């Protein structure tokens, strides 16, 4: 009989919930980084700069929103399959979500950091010059504050989801426990779910 490491499952669920929350708040923080009037020092009229003026920030909003929904599905599947037989479609779905969700979060956070790691610059097309959004006005500082918070939250969500996936994989492959020689393979597989391509040591 394989003795399951029972703590792995609830801990992975906690990190999934944390990832969902961080991703959702990240999207909300970026969405509120809007309608902040920034005054340029080049004699041009005031310009309202929003997150939608930067493709990387738009991608972050879309990616974190999608990741939130997908991770919610993963949380449901991970929670509902406890105590039930593990069907192949569930495992395949979990593996797919485990690859897609971190990819969305890491790429969106990386793209946002590439644009606004230290400062955020906006290009004034009519005069062909750019200015610092963060330093141009108090409103610009507020805009950048929201953007930076959103970036770090997206990165935190990516780390949380990755750790949840690590615990899930570890539980499938190693955390099912050790198998005793007195039990049959069929009993160990059916009772503790030592499957999914992983083998229990006898």
Swiss-Prot record:
Its main location: membrane. Disulfide bonds: none annotated. GO terms for cellular component: plasma membrane. Keywords: Cell membrane, Membrane, Transmembrane, Transmembrane helix. It is a multi-pass membrane protein. InterPro entries: CASP/CASPL, CASP_dom, CASPL. It comes from the Eukaryota. It is found in: Cell membrane. The keyword Cell membrane applies. Residues 32-56, 116-146 are extracellular. Residues 1-10, 78-94, 168-202 are cytoplasmic. The chain crosses the membrane at residues 11-31, 57-77, 95-115, 147-167. Homodimer and heterodimers. Belongs to the Casparian strip membrane proteins (CASP) family. This is CASP-like protein 1U4. It comes from Sorghum bicolor.
